[in-house]
Amino acid sequence: MDTLNIAGKHYNSRLLVGTGKYKDFEQTRAAIDASGAEIITVAIRRTNIGQNAGEPSLLDYLPPEEFTYLPNTAGCYSAEDAVRTLRLARELLDGHKLVKLEVLGDPNTLYPNMLETIKAAETLIKDGFDVMVYCSDDPIIAKQLEDMGCAAVMPLASLIGSGMGILNPWNLQIIIENAKIPVLVDAGVGTASDAAIAMELGCQGVLMNTAIAAAKDPVLMAGAMKKAVEAGREAFLAGRMPRKLYSASPSSPTSGLIG
């Protein structure tokens, strides 16, 4: 069976979704159900998963028994902040080890600071975490993160929240060809065709939040993204026909024609 394998666990869905930017937890739940996602990512610094007693908790709407939580470090600008945030998440989620690391470079672009990211990844891996890492689309950096022991690399397609789609498919393709761990596109997806293209390139999965949450109809878009990821994966496995400027062979048979 064709499944996504991350840190020794298999998942049927290759679509990973965020939990932020929805109007309320009810809409969050409805969109995630429509997406079919099994892995959901949560910003520990922005979302209550038990650290704020007396306030509504995401855990009440998306129980950890139903989903694999992927705590992330959105809003962290240093390795120290990221490590501290994920250690807190591990305490709140009873020893949970699978995490998404992102260390941002500046608040305008949210581009990853790779020096701080590598520093944090080293510490987290030594501390027993399974690290899925948000990174630039630099093939050398991606390979270094794999060699360090990261569970997955997640290069950006374009800037977080931009909806610009895949701006550099060639770098993504190099990363995919060189990798022995899952490569997932993270950031920049704007619509279903972007997700399909990522999967057609050979990505093992796609992670998104804003593309669904900021849609006019988030629940409908979540369903569209599910279909796009599935179609893109099947197209990759099927193998597309070669590109040609023109074809000398007609698509219809020529034998047996009259005259």
UniProtKB/Swiss-Prot annotation:
Keyword Magnesium: no
GO biological process, one term: thiamine diphosphate biosynthetic process
Catalytic activity entry: [ThiS sulfur-carrier protein]-C-terminal-Gly-aminoethanethioate + 2-iminoacetate + 1-deoxy-D-xylulose 5-phosphate = [ThiS sulfur-carrier protein]-C-terminal Gly-Gly + 2-[(2R,5Z)-2-carboxy-4-methylthiazol-5(2H)-ylidene]ethyl phosphate + 2 H2O + H(+)
InterPro entries in the cross-refs: Aldolase_TIM (IPR013785), Thiazole_synthase_ThiG (IPR033983), ThiG (IPR008867)
Keywords per UniProt: Cytoplasm, Schiff base, Thiamine biosynthesis, Transferase
Pfam families registered for this protein in UniProt: ThiG
Any GO CC annotation of this UniProt entry: cytoplasm
Positions of 1-deoxy-D-xylulose 5-phosphate binding: 161, 187-188, 209-210
Source domain of life: Bacteria
Active site (catalytic residues): 100 (schiff-base intermediate with dxp)
UniProt GO molecular function: thiazole synthase activity
Pathway: Cofactor biosynthesis; thiamine diphosphate biosynthesis
EC number(s) stated in the UniProt entry for this protein: 2.8.1.10
Cellular compartment(s): Cytoplasm
Primary residence: cytoplasm
Similarity comment: Belongs to the ThiG family.
Chain's role: Catalyzes the rearrangement of 1-deoxy-D-xylulose 5-phosphate (DXP) to produce the thiazole phosphate moiety of thiamine. Sulfur is provided by the thiocarboxylate moiety of the carrier protein ThiS. In vitro, sulfur can be provided by H(2)S.
Quaternary data: Homotetramer. Forms heterodimers with either ThiH or ThiS.
Protein name as catalogued: Thiazole synthase
